[in-house]
UniProtKB/Swiss-Prot annotation:
This is Zinc finger X-chromosomal protein. Pfam families: zf-C2H2 (PF00096), Zfx_Zfy_act (PF04704). It comes from Mus musculus (Mouse). SUPFAM superfamilies: beta-beta-alpha zinc fingers. Belongs to the krueppel C2H2-type zinc-finger protein family. ZFX/ZFY subfamily. PROSITE patterns: ZINC_FINGER_C2H2_1, ZINC_FINGER_C2H2_2. Probable transcriptional activator. InterPro entries: Transcrp_activ_Zfx/Zfy-dom, Znf_C2H2_sf, Znf_C2H2_type. A zinc finger (C2H2-type) spans 419-444, 450-472, 482-504, 513-536, 542-564, 570-593, 599-621, 627-650, 656-678, 684-707, 713-735, 741-764, 770-792.
C-alpha cells in the first residue's frame, strides 16, 4: 500500500452478500468478480481491499452524482462483527449505499460524487489513502462527517481535499454516507477506534447500495474495479431528448451549520470523462436523463425533540415526500423553499432512507417493483463494543387496505406518517380523522373503483372484480360448465352451483318422504329409515337363544334376556322393590316414596329427596329450547321431544292399522299398545262387514257412514245430503264465505272447532296440559299420556 491510499479492510465470515439473489460472486486470486442484476449490497468482503487511487475532489462542499435509474431501496444489510484486533465503534449500515471515504478533521464533506461507471481513482491527496480499488457505482454521498480524525500508517495526516467532479453519463450505483460527530483513529494494520469523551452524541451511519440494472463488477488487481452494465434499456426518447428527474434527500446537519439546502444539476456527458478514463464499453453505455439533486439538512437537537409534542402536529407539512407521477414542480417546492422547477417528471421514490435516518422504525416498506426494503443499523453508542447484529423486525401488514399514507418530515427531523385525502389533498395524522373527513365527499364514496369491461358490474374490491372476470371466462367455455344433478341447470363455477344446491335443500326441507312399500309418509328422512327397519326389514342379527326373537341392536337383546333370566338389577333404596328397567324404578320411587322426598318442584310438582336434586331439576325448566323443527317454528328442549313433535304433526300417514277398529298409528309400538287395550273388552261386530269395535258409538258411526244410503239432512244451497244434523251444520258454515276459526300464529284456518283446538295445542302451545298421574310428565294429547302410562308404568305397584 502506498502513501496515497487509505486502506479499509473488513474481515467477515466468508460471505459476499447479493441482495437480489440473482448475482454470482467468486474469487480469482486477488480478483473479485461480482455479477449484479438489479441491486447489490456490498457487505463482508473476504480477505480483500477496497481502494480508491488518486481521486482529487475540487469542491468538498457539495458534489452529488444521483442515480438516474434506481429509486428503490431493496433490503437491509448489517455488517457483522469485525474479527480483528479491535472493534469499530462507528456504525455502518448498508441498505443502498457504500461508505468508502475517511475525511480529516479539518475538512468536512457535505456531498462527494463520483459519476457513472467511472472508477473513483486518481486521488492524489495525502489525507485520504485507500489501497487498491473501490467500486463507486451509481453515486456516492458523503454527508455529515464532522470532527473525524483518521490516522494512516500510524500517523495523523491533515491535508485539504480538492474535488474534481468527473463527467460521465452512466451512474450505476448510489452511496450515501451519513457520519456523525465522533472521533476515530484508523490504523493501517487493523481498525482500532478510540471513542471521544462523553460530550459526543450518539450517532448512526447509514450505508446504502442499490442497482436497477444488471451489471458486472470486475477487479483485476491493477486497473481498479469496473462496472459493466449490460442493460440496454434507454430511458431517453428517440429524438435524443431525455427527461429530467428530481430526487430529494435529507441528512443531518452539523451543529451551527447555516447551509441547510441546495441543488446540483447533473447533465448528460460523453462516455469518456475529462480525466481520460474510458468506460468499459462506450457503445453500450446508457444515455442518462438530466436529473436535479435536491438536498436538505436538518439540525438534530435533542432538546428540541424533547420539547416537541408530535401529537400536536396536525396538517402542517415541513417537507413532504410525493409518491407517484405528480408534477415535479410540486415536489421541488416541498423540498426547497419556494424553488420552482418546470417541465419535470417525478419518478417514484420511496423515502425509506429518511425514515431510517431519523427514526428507529425499521419495518419493511414495499415499493412498486415488488421488492422489500428494510433498514438494519449498528449503534455505536456502546463505545468500543462489538458491532451487534440486530434481528430485523417482522414485517407488519398494513392496517388499511383503502387508505394511502405519506411520510413527512417534522421540524425535529423525525418522519411523520400522515393520511392524505385523495380528493382535496388535506392531510390527517390518523386514519380515523381521514374517515371522518371523507364524509364530506359523499359523491366519491358512492363511486366504485372497479368496473367490468364486459358488463355493468362495479365493485370496490379488486378480488371481487377478479372473481367476476373469471366467471366471464368460464361462461364462455360451454364444455367446462357444471350441471346441477337435480334440475339440470348449468353454472360457470362450483361456487354458484353450491349456492344453487342450497336452494334445492331449502325447498326439500318441506318435502314429504314416502315409503315405497306402503303408504307411510313423513317429513323426516330419518323417520322413514326407521320405519323401513321396523316394518319392512327382515334383518334381525341379534337372536334370543331362549325364544328365537330377533333384535336389531344388542342393547335390545340384553334387556329382553332379563325376562328369561329374571334379573332385576335396579333396586329401590327405600324398600325391597326391584326392576329390570331403570325408568320403572324412577317411577316407583317418585310415586311410592313421596314422603321420603319432601322437596317438590314448583312447576311440575315432582318430589325429590334433597335440595340438590330439586335445583338440578329446575335447570330443565330454565333450559332454553335449542332444538328447532325444520318444518315449523316449534322448539324442543331435547331431541326426543322434537322427534315426537315431528311424528305427531308432520307425519301425515298412519300406516299401522288396527285390525279391530281400523285405527291408524305412526309406529308399530303404538299399534301394539293399542291392540292390548282391546283385550278383555267386548267386541261389537258390524253385521254388514267384518268391522269390529269395542265402542258401540264408533260402530254406529261406521254403519251410518259406510252402509247407510239414506241421507235425510240435505243442504238447501247445494242439495248435499248428510246422515246427521251436526254434519249439516258444519257444512252450512262453508257457505258463509268466511273461515270461522283462524289461527293467530299461522295461516291455518278451519270451520271445525275441535280441529282448531287440536291444532293450537299441538303446534303453538308450549304447555303440556295432560299430565301423568305417576310421574307428572306432561303431554299435549290424552292419547299420548295413555301411551306413556302403558309403556313406563305398567309395573307400578308390583312388589
Amino acid at each position: 500500500m502506498d502513501e496515497d491510499g487509505l486502506e479499509l479492510q473488513q474481515q467477515a465470515p466468508n460471505s459476499f452478500f447479493d441482495a437480489t439473489g440473482a448475482g454470482a460472486t467468486h474469487m480469482d486470486g486477488n480478483q473479485i468478480v461480482v455479477e449484479v442484476q438489479e441491486t447489490v449490497y456490498v457487505s463482508d468482503v473476504v480477505d480483500s481491499d477496497i481502494t480508491v487511487h488518486n481521486y482529487v475532489p475540487d469542491d468538498p462542499d457539495s458534489v452529488v452524482i444521483q442515480d438516474v435509474i434506481e429509486d428503490v431501496v431493496i433490503e437491509d444489510v448489517q455488517c457483522t462483527d469485525i474479527m480483528d484486533e479491535a472493534d469499530v465503534s462507528e456504525t455502518v449500515i448498508i441498505p443502498e449505499q457504500v461508505l468508502d471515504s475517511d475525511v480529516t478533521e479539518e475538512v468536512s464533506l457535505t456531498h462527494c460524487t463520483v459519476p457513472d461507471d467511472v472508477l473513483a481513482s486518481d486521488i492524489t491527496s495525502a489525507s485520504i489513502s485507500m489501497p487498491e480499488h473501490v467500486l463507486t457505482s451509481e453515486s456516492i454521498h458523503v454527508s455529515d462527517v464532522g470532527h473525524v480524525e483518521h490516522v494512516v500508517h500510524d500517523s495523523v495526516v491533515e491535508a485539504e481535499i480538492v474535488t474534481d467532479p468527473l463527467a460521465a453519463d452512466v451512474v450505476s450505483e448510489e452511496v450515501l454516507v451519513a457520519d456523525c460527530a465522533s472521533e476515530a483513529v484508523i490504523d493501517a494494520n487493523g481498525i482500532p477506534v478510540n471513542q471521544q469523551d462523553e460530550e459526543k452524541n450518539n450517532c448512526e451511519d447509514y450505508l446504502m447500495i442499490s442497482l436497477d440494472d444488471a451489471g458486472k463488477i470486475e477487479h483485476d488487481g491493477s486497473s481498479g474495479l469496473t462496472m459493466d452494465n449490460e442493460t440496454e434499456i434507454d430511458p431517453c426518447k428517440v429524438d435524443g431528448t431525455c427527461p429530467e428527474v428530481i430526487k430529494v434527500y435529507i441528512f443531518k446537519a452539523d451543529p451551527g451549520e447555516d447551509d441547510l439546502g441546495g441543488t446540483v444539476d447533473i447533465v448528460e456527458s460523453e462516455p469518456e470523462n475529462e480525466h481520460g478514463v474510458e468506460l468499459l464499453d462506450p457503445n453500450n453505455s446508457i444515455r442518462v436523463p438530466r436529473e436535479k439533486m435536491v438536498y436538505m439538512a436538518v439540525n438534530d437537537s435533542q432538546q428540541e425533540e424533547e420539547e416537541l409534542n408530535v401529537a400536536e402536529i396536525a396538517d402542517e407539512v415541513y417537507m413532504e415526500v410525493i409518491v407517484g407521477e405528480e408534477d415535479a414542480a410540486a415536489a421541488a417546492a416541498a423540498a426547497v423553499h419556494e424553488q420552482q422547477v418546470e417541465d419535470n417528471e417525478m419518478k417514484t421514490f420511496m423515502p425509506i432512507a429518511w425514515a431510517a435516518a431519523y427514526g428507529n422504525n425499521s419495518d419493511g416498506i414495499e415499493n412498486r417493483n415488488g421488492t422489500a426494503s428494510a433498514l438494519l443499523h449498528i449503534d455505536e453508542s456502546a463505545g468500543l463494543g462489538r458491532l451487534a447484529k440486530q434481528k430485523p423486525k417482522k414485517r407488519r401488514r398494513p392496517d388499511s387496505r383503502q387508505y394511502q399514507t405519506a411520510i413527512i418530515i417534522g421540524p425535529d427531523g423525525h418522519p411523520l406518517t400522515v393520511y392524505p385525502c385523495m380528493i382535496c389533498g388535506k392531510k390527517f395524522k390518523s386514519r380515523g380523522f381521514l374517515k371522518r373527513h371523507m364524509k364530506n365527499h359523499p359523491e366519491h364514496l358512492a363511486k366504485k373503483k372497479y368496473r367490468c369491461t364486459d358488463c355493468d358490474y362495479t365493485t370496490n374490491k379488486k378480488i371481487s372484480l377478479h372473481n367476476h372476470l373469471e366467471s366471464h371466462k368460464l361462461t364462455s367455455k360451454a364444455e367446462k360448465a357444471i350441471e346441477c344433478d337435480e334440475c339440470g341447470k348449468h353454472f360457470s363455477h362450483a361456487g354458484a352451483l353450491f349456492t344453487h344446491k342450497m336452494v334445492h335443500k331449502e325447498k326439500g326441507a318441506n318435502k314429504m318422504h314416502k315409503c315405497k312399500f306402503c303408504e307411510y309418509e313423513t317429513a323426516e328422512q330419518g323417520l322413514l329409515n326407521r320405519h323401513l327397519l321396523a316394518v319392512h326389514s327382515k334383518n334381525f342379527p341379534h337372536i334370543c337363544v331362549e325364544c328365537g326373537k330377533g333384535f336389531r341392536h344388542p342393547s335390545e337383546l340384553k334387556k329382553h334376556m332379563r325376562i328369561h333370566t329374571g334379573e332385576k338389577p335396579y333396586e329401590c333404596q327405600y324398600c325391597e322393590y326391584r326392576s329390570a328397567d331403570s325408568s320403572n324404578l324412577k317411577t316407583h320411587v317418585k310415586t311410592k316414596h313421596s314422603k321420603e322426598m319432601p322437596f317438590k318442584c314448583d312447576i311440575c310438582l315432582l318430589t325429590f329427596s334433597d335440595t340438590k336434586e330439586v335445583q338440578q331439576h329446575a335447570l330443565v325448566h330454565q333450559e332454553s329450547k335449542t332444538h328447532q323443527c325444520l318444518h315449523c317454528d316449534h322448539k324442543s328442549s331435547n331431541s326426543s321431544d322434537l322427534k315426537r313433535h315431528i311424528i305427531s304433526v308432520h307425519t301425515k300417514d298412519y300406516p299401522h292399522k288396527c285390525d279391530m277398529c281400523d285405527k291408524g298409528f305412526h309406529r308399530p309400538s303404538e299399534l301394539k299398545k293399542h291392540v292390548a287395550a282391546h283385550k278383555g273388552k267386548k267386541m261389537h261386530q258390524c253385521r254388514h262387514c267384518d268391522f269390529k269395535i269395542a265402542d258401540p258409538f264408533v260402530l254406529s258411526r261406521h254403519i251410518l257412514s259406510v252402509h247407510t244410503k239414506d241421507l235425510p239432512f240435505r243442504c238447501k244451497r247445494c242439495r248435499k245430503g248428510f246422515r246427521q244434523q251436526s254434519e249439516l251444520k258444519k257444512h252450512m258454515k262453508t257457505h258463509s264465505g268466511r273461515k270461522v276459526y283462524q289461527c293467530e300464529y299461522c295461516e291455518y284456518s278451519t270451520t271445525d272447532a275441535s280441529g282448531f283446538k287440536r291444532h293450537v295445542i299441538s303446534i303453538h302451545t308450549k304447555d303440556y296440559p295432560h299430565r301423568c298421574e305417576y310421574c307428572k310428565k306432561g303431554f299435549r294429547r290424552p292419547s299420548e299420556k295413555n301411551q306413556h302410562i302403558m309403556r313406563h308404568h305398567k309395573e307400578v305397584g308390583l312388589p
